[in-house]
């Protein structure tokens, strides 16, 4: 891949993704196999005005080894230096860039119970720091092709060709062409126009139906609004948290989901794939879940904490989105969630609540924004998915028909 194109992508992440402000610190989290591109992103952040760029390196093989060899108690421990680092982030609010390149099957064979216990133990310590940063800093998730991931997506290609093809797909879906920044300005404007229309309807519930058996009704929070593309921090900094993105999303009301929904794509979770699954909801809670593969892992996900069995997001993405048109199954939620409509179990987004900077976290939880240590998207969009809005004034308005926008 030409370095000029990769530099344009790095600039997009720095200037459109996190939109680094002059004098701001940046923290990049990436796998060890991406030093060249991480350097490009760091350089782009400095050019955008960053004061300091720090890189946190990860290595999936070491993560797997630690889960296998360390005790649950050790895995749960948050050391004093980690707490100090979290407090430093609370105090300085750096931009956070997450570059994904992991192998979708990289944690296959490790105990989901042990992983869940470790995460639960750490979360109780980390949550107060996370809550203090909620809505106050820019962050962006983007992707870089790791070799194992590329071979999973393109199994019949050589390793080098698979990586090249995955690069091409990532850059295409992220609109990295002649003028990517202008392209993203136009894309954000289109998503905002769709959100404005949806917000004008006064939606009380969304009803999902598809021929695969999906029939689910989800309640909306009256104070909530659809968001899409870029968003603002409480301090007014505009950023794009996901590159790419094709969604208009909202946080539904906790406790108001009834029916059953069937997945339309595999879910990559903790380095393993959950395939062909369904979840049934009663009074908002997931009460039954089945899967062809990794059913136990799905059930562990749902049981992670009190909020993990409830919905935190409803996202509308047309089945003919540019990502779905590639015909590629990415085995990565960042891309597959933007191929079609999806829901998310777990944490809701406080910034979908109107006037959220002037509300407390407790007030937003009381309105019905779900809280959880997890936020896991799963894809439900199909070519015949119909979504109908039942509005507070009694109107019934088609939102999706035949898998795509009805307006």
State each model region's role.
Residues 11, 199-201, 270-272, 307, ...:
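Short solvent-exposed loop/turn micro-motifs enriched in small/polar/acidic residues
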Residues 250-306:
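Long, well-ordered mid-to-C-terminal structural blocks that present hydrophobic/aromatic surfaces
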Residues 256-258, 274-276, 283, 309-313, ...:
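Active-site lining segments that contact anionic ligands and/or coordinate catalytic metals
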Residues 286-357:
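Dual-mode signal for accessory low-complexity, basic/Gly-rich regions
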Residues 362-407:
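Extended hydrophobic packing segments that form well-structured cores
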């Amino acid at each position: 891949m030409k370095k000029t194109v990769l530099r344009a992508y790095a600039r997009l992440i720095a200037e459109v993704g996190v939109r680094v402000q002059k004098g701001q610190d940046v923290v990049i989290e990436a796998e060890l196999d991406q030093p060249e591109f991480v350097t490009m992103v760091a350089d782009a952040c400095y050019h955008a005005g960053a004061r300091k760029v720090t890189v946190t390196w990860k290595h999936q093989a070491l993560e797997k080894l630690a889960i296998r060899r360390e005790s649950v108690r050790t895995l749960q421990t948050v050391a004093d230096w980690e707490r100090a680092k979290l407090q430093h982030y609370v105090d300085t609010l750096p931009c956070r860039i997450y570059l994904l390149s992991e192998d979708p099957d990289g944690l296959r064979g490790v105990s989901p119970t042990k992983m869940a216990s470790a995460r639960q133990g750490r979360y109780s310590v980390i949550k107060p720091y996370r809550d203090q940063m909620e809505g106050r800093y820019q962050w962006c998730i983007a992707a870089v092709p790791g070799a194992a991931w590329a071979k999973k997506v393109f199994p019949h290609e050589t390793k080098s060709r698979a990586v090249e093809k995955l690069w091409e797909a990532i850059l295409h879906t992220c609109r990295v062409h002649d003028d990517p920044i202008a392209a993203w300005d136009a894309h954000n404007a289109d998503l905002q126009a769709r959100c404005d229309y949806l917000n004008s309807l006064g939606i009380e519930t969304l009803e999902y139906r598809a021929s695969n058996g999906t029939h689910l009704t989800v309640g909306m929070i009256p104070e909530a609004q659809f968001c899409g593309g870029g968003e603002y921090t409480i301090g007014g900094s505009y950023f794009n948290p996901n590159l790419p993105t094709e969604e208009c999303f909202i946080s539904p009301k906790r406790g108001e989901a009834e029916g059953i929904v069937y997945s339309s794509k595999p879910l990559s979770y903790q380095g393993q794939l959950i395939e062909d699954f369904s979840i049934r909801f009663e009074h908002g809670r997931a009460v039954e879940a089945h899967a062809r593969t990794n059913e136990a892992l799905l059930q562990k996900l749902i049981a992670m904490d009190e909020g993990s069995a409830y919905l935190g997001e409803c996202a509308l993405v047309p089945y003919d989105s540019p990502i779905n048109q590639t015909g590629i199954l990415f085995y990565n939620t960042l891309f597959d969630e933007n191929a079609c409509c999806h829901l998310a179990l777990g944490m809701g987004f406080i910034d979908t609540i109107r006037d959220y900077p002037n509300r407390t976290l407790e007030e937003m939880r009381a309105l019905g924004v779900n809280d959880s240590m997890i936020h896991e998207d799963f894809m439900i969009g199909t070519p015949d998915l119909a979504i109908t809005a039942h509005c507070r004034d009694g109107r019934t308005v088609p939102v999706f028909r035949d898998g795509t926008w009805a307006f």
